[in-house]
């Protein structure tokens, strides 16, 4: 009698629904997944090792390139770890700016997650709407750092510069954009960055309503997500879940509330929590988080308008002196030269700093030996713990559901492979 064998299928590494270079070896019985084996490492760039050969400041841009959808949140954990070792604290205005940009980054990430997840499942319109809003938030990145993605804006002791009074303007009309459209876009960018962000926060809840109209009660969307990839609260904790993956299973754990950092303890916001622990609940948690992030951004804008002040500490052994001081004072020039050639030395010790990243708990464990470079840098990526559970979440589901589960895990391989 012929022996019945399971069928092995390679999913990726170039599959459009794989969110990067994921290779999945699926063992199938017909169309039902019996085992899912993720093969990682295809985007490994030795970030942790590279950081050991750069000064503390030079290693900062590597952080942007880990989870390349949530750039400033990665930087935040890194600079917080350095600040712990140095025993310094950023000025209050810098802390508010950091929190505001952390939440802008959270919205950026969730828009990408929501849009790509819907696209994977077969709903294309949401992806296009989400990128319409992402464009505005990318302009905020560009206004403060000059870069739309890899900002390198945070610094140990504060941020690179204060918020600008003007926004980048669009150029002349082209075959893609008429003169009227360009003028309308520039009108929204006529004030300061805070004006632009405030205008965005007024519009954004209506945009989220649009996404929910398209998806939340859509019967096809619900059929594809409800009851798929269920993880109960105890199992979620055992697997090391954090962020929306953990909260979707009904565990109200959010570092912004449980271990507040910067000025999160002064912010008024709620932590959305799921009930069933399936893909649909995780989707609802992310949508609700975008609304809460919008609330936090509004509070930051209001405070920043009324409280001018320094955005960097005054210690010129860590923070660069101003350009005018550098050109008129020899001592400041020496500080500047030493800072950008040799960098600053960090006293021996070790520190762990974690932030509530859009994907979960993103942590940096930093060991210093008194030199101007990290002795050891360990990155705790939330997606790594989530991907290991893919086998458990996908087992017994159809092959099409694997795409839904990968989408709900919100995987980005920059942080997983490092």
Curated annotation (Swiss-Prot):
Stored InterPro entries: NADH_Q_OxRdtase_suD, NADH_UbQ_OxRdtase_49kDa_CS, NDH1_su_D/H, NiFe-Hase_large
E.C. designation(s): 7.1.1.-
Keywords in alphabetical order: Cell inner membrane, Cell membrane, Membrane, NAD, Quinone, Translocase, Transport, Ubiquinone
Enzyme class (EC, first level): translocase
Predominant location category: membrane
Membrane disposition: Peripheral membrane protein
PROSITE patterns hit by this protein: COMPLEX1_49K
Catalytic activity: a quinone + NADH + 5 H(+)(in) = a quinol + NAD(+) + 4 H(+)(out)
Localization of this protein: Cell inner membrane
Superkingdom classification of source: Bacteria
GO molecular function: NAD binding; NADH:ubiquinone reductase (non-electrogenic) activity; quinone binding
GO cellular component: plasma membrane
Binding partners and assembly: NDH-1 is composed of 14 different subunits. Subunits NuoB, C, D, E, F, and G constitute the peripheral sector of the complex.
Function of the protein: NDH-1 shuttles electrons from NADH, via FMN and iron-sulfur (Fe-S) centers, to quinones in the respiratory chain. The immediate electron acceptor for the enzyme in this species is believed to be ubiquinone. Couples the redox reaction to proton translocation (for every two electrons transferred, four hydrogen ions are translocated across the cytoplasmic membrane), and thus conserves the redox energy in a proton gradient.
Family designation: Belongs to the complex I 49 kDa subunit family.
NCBIfam families: NuoD (TIGR01962), PRK06075.1 (NF004739)
PANTHER family listed in its UniProt record: NADH DEHYDROGENASE [UBIQUINONE] IRON-SULFUR PROTEIN 2, MITOCHONDRIAL, NADH-UBIQUINONE OXIDOREDUCTASE 49 KDA SUBUNIT
Protein name: NADH-quinone oxidoreductase subunit D
């Amino acid at each position: 009698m012929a022996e019945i064998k399971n069928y092995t299928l390679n999913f990726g590494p170039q599959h459009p629904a794989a969110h990067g270079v994921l290779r999945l070896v699926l063992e199938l019985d017909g169309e039902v997944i019996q085992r899912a084996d993720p093969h990682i490492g295809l985007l490994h760039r030795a970030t942790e090792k590279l950081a050991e050969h750069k000064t503390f400041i030079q290693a900062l841009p590597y952080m942007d390139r880990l989870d390349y959808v949530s750039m400033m949140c990665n930087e935040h954990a890194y600079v917080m770890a350095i600040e712990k070792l140095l025993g310094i604290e950023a000025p209050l205005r810098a802390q508010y700016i950091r929190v505001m940009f952390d939440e802008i980054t959270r919205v950026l990430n969730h828009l990408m997650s929501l849009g790509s997840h819907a696209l994977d499942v077969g709903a294309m319109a949401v992806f296009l709407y989400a990128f319409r809003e992402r464009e505005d938030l990318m302009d905020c990145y560009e206004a403060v750092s000059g870069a739309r993605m890899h900002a390198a804006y945070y610094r140990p002791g504060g941020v690179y510069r204060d918020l600008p009074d003007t926004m980048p303007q669009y150029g002349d009309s082209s075959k893609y954009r008429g003169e009227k459209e360009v003028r309308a876009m520039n009108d929204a960018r006529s004030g300061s960055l805070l004006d632009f962000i405030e205008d965005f926060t007024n519009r954004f809840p209506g945009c989220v309503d649009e996404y929910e109209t398209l998806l939340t009660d859509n019967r096809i969307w619900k059929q594809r997500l409800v009851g798929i990839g269920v993880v109960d609260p105890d199992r979620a904790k055992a697997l090391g879940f954090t962020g929306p993956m953990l909260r979707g299973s009904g565990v109200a754990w959010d570092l912004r509330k449980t271990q507040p950092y910067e000025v999160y303890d002064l912010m008024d916001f709620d932590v959305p929590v799921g009930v069933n622990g399936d893909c649909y609940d995780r989707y609802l948690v992310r949508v609700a988080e975008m609304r809460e992030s919008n609330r936090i951004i509004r509070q930051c804008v209001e405070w920043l308008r009324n409280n001018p002040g320094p955005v960097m500490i005054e210690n010129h052994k860590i923070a660069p002196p101003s350009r005018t001081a550098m050109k008129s004072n020899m001592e400041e020039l020496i500080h500047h030269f030493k800072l950008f050639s040799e960098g600053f030395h960090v006293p021996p010790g070790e520190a762990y700093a974690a932030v509530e990243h859009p994907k979960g708990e993103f942590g940096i464990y930093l060991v210093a030996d008194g030199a101007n470079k990290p002795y050891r840098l360990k990155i705790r990526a939330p997606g790594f713990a989530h991907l290991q559970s893919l086998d458990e979440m996908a087992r017994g589901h159809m092959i099409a559901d694997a795409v839904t589960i990968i989408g709900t895990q919100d995987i980005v391989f920059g942080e997983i492979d490092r």
